[in-house]
Design a protein with these regions (language model features):
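Conserved AdoMet/S-adenosylmethionine-binding subsite of the radical SAM
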Residues: 91-202
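Short, conserved acidic/polar surface loops in the N-terminal third of protein domains
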Residues: 66-70, 77-82, 117-120, 145-146
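Short, charged beta->alpha transition segments
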Residues: 63, 85-96
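Residues at secondary-structure transition points
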Residues: 56, 81-88
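Glycine-rich phosphate-binding "P-loop"
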Residues: 75-84, 104-109
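N-terminal [4Fe-4S]-dependent radical SAM core
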Residues: 1-62, 66, 70-77
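Short alpha-helix boundary/capping segments
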Residues: 53, 82, 173-176
Length: 202
């Protein structure tokens, strides 16, 4: 059971009570916040998703990248139009895409939303679908949180944004990115025991 009354899902370790509406770095309460669900055909080809990926784009983020291409949905001040806030609507949209012979379900910027991600996966499976799960992350993750996903996530798709902590602080507003992300990627590798690349596709 993931405790959002003392949220430490990500390396910020804000320890806020999201169930009572307290906001940490990501500015998320305990509710479901999905900006978009869509069929995405531009994913990295090595994941083997020839028919595309059903991507769930969560709102908000645990980084503050000044160059973010999704800034309309990722920033604390973002007001997301038509945000999906109930599970049934989300799962119905996902199932409608999976029915089109789509075998991959991706979660984008899922770190602060892991309890919701897990519930969605469970509901999708109860509909009779077993897509491969892609965890698409900025790399700023807690190892202990990633361990909760062992056996659930099929493909980790991390960024490694910085090898320079000064740049990470200046451009994304986060401390100690390099060591934190390397430890997280190491845990992902421990779980999956292989790296997907052009020579070793899914």
């Amino acid at each position: 059971m993931i405790d959002l009354t003392n949220c430490n899902l990500c390396p910020h370790r804000c320890s806020v009570n999201r169930e009572q509406g307290q906001l940490g770095f990501c500015h998320l309460d305990a509710g479901l916040h999905i900006a978009n669900i869509s069929l995405h055909t531009g994913e990295e080809p090595i994941d083997g998703s020839e028919n595309g990926v059903c991507n769930v784009f969560f709102s908000h983020c645990n980084l503050r990248c000044v160059y973010c291409q999704n800034y309309q949905i990722s920033q604390p001040q973002s007001v997301v139009k038509h945000e999906i806030t109930d599970y049934e609507s989300a799962v119905n949209q996902i199932v409608a895409i999976l029915q089109k012979n789509v075998n991959f379900l991706g979660f984008v910027s899922p770190t602060s939303h892991i309890p919701h991600m897990l519930k969605i996966i469970d509901m999708v499976q109860k509909y009779g679908f077993s897509p491969k799960i892609i965890y698409n992350t900025n790399g700023y993750e807690n190892v202990e949180t990633l361990r909760l996903l062992e056996g659930i996530v099929d493909i980790y798709l991390p960024d490694f944004k910085y090898a320079d902590d000064e740049l990470a602080q200046r451009l994304s507003g986060i401390p100690n990115y390099t060591e934190t992300a390397l430890a997280a990627i190491g845990e992902m590798y421990r779980q999956k025991k292989s790296v997907l690349n052009d020579e070793n596709p899914a």
